[in-house]
Amino acid sequence: FLANISHEIRTPLHGIMAFAELALLKEKTPPHRYLRAILQSSRALLEIINDLLDVSKIEAGHLELEQAPFMLDDVVHHVCTVALHNAHAGGIELVVDMDPNMQIALIGDAGRLQQIIMNLVTNAVKFTGPGGQICVTLKQGHAEPLPSDTCPEQRRVQIICFVRDTGVGIAPEFLGQLFQPFRQVDASTTRRHGGTGLGLCICRQLVEMMHGEIWVESEPNVGSTFAFSIPLCTQPDSGATAQLPPPPAQP
């Protein structure tokens, strides 16, 4: 794990240093291109550090979930907008299929829900080749009451999200390792596609904190489906539904 983390941190750091040196050497060249590359590398480094901090907070029991009003379609649209660039760059089609009748005015931690979906979509983009497809599907079901649940029965909903890809797939013997901390399928995959191996672990921990469940189905050379289900409470006096899903992203 330490070797993989060191490699992942070193890569964006090298990028930051290299482009900073180029910007200094080529004084007559507009620095925007180098600054953009430095910014991208800095963001990649920040993501790694944030993952490490999240794991540390969760394992120490110091991470608290917010309970605030949010719109589910805003969360999904933001994720797909951010993921769209990398998907298009890789020649991948990104499609969103959101049940038009599901409730979208919810109460919960929108930031952490967005983090879960973003991790799953980013992972799918990483392991799907040119000409492939990723489909984000959201459905709604009935949620059973939880201990100390203050949400009235008529406002309880179960949000189910599927992220399907036509990527490389995962062998059955590795499926049980995917959501474990500091575990990856194999080192060669890590080197080819990058990543610390913390993203799926964080997804599992966040979903469990939300009293939900997460699972995966996969077949080598066919693709994978990562899915999770969490109970949420709808906002009072709100009948807002996803009349139109976020626009499908075409390459």
Located regions from the model:
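Glycine-rich ATP-binding loops of the HATPase_c
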Residues: 211-217
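ATPase catalytic-site recognition across NTP-hydrolyzing enzymes
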Residues: 176-180
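Conserved catalytic submotifs in the C-terminal HATPase_c
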Residues: 66-71, 88, 93-104, 141
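Short alpha-helical segment of the dimerization/phosphotransfer core of two-component systems
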Residues: 40-48
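Primarily the dimerization/phosphotransfer
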Residues: 1-25, 43
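Disordered, acidic interdomain junction associated with two-component signaling
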Residues: 78, 85, 89, 140-160, ...
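Helix-loop junction within the histidine kinase core
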Residues: 56-67
